[in-house]
Amino acid sequence: MRFLFLFLFLFFSFQQNSWSENILTEFLVAKPSMPDPRFKETVIVMLYHNQGKGAAGLVINKPIRTMLISEFFKSSNMTPPEKIVDKEITLYWGGPVDAEHVFFIHSSDYKSNDFISSNRDFTITQEPKILFDIVKNKGPQEYIILSGIAAWEPGQLDSEMMRDDWNKKSNNYTSPFDNGKEMWSRLINSRDI
């Protein structure tokens, strides 16, 4: 039931682009004492946090696997363009909820028409057009592709914050495009966290 609630919440929020409390300028950094093994040493870019509605974000430092973009098209049941520049991409674990949903975080040099959230440095979208532009060498300079999302029910993330599982960090200190594997250790060892 919890996952059905989260799916419906995320589906309608994304469809309506109605993030009333967009906090894309914040990252959550798991503390070394994080009790949930799924979130050990994770860095999450926050999409939304509202005590009454819950929270959502994307884990940005957990690569799952590297593959050719043609493999990604095939595994996503998408028809690739006829002429494809087959380059390697890395798929990241975005979180434990809705693993079949794909998200893209890309640099601001590329414009998405249908985006979930955006700031001056990067944009988050589910628009598949970005893949077609990447294979045509018309995509963003920087991007990451994520499977799944991290989502919390109302009050759940607040409890985890009170329990001291997470630290907040502004995006002045990192970018989603920094080295994923080393991002957590660099952030957790910085003085201001």
Show the residue positions of the predicted features:
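Short hydrophobic/aromatic segments of transmembrane alpha-helices and their interfaces
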Residues: M1-F3, P140
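Sec-dependent N-terminal signal peptides
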Residues: F3-S13
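A short aromatic-anchored loop/beta-hairpin motif
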Residues: W19-L146, A150-I193
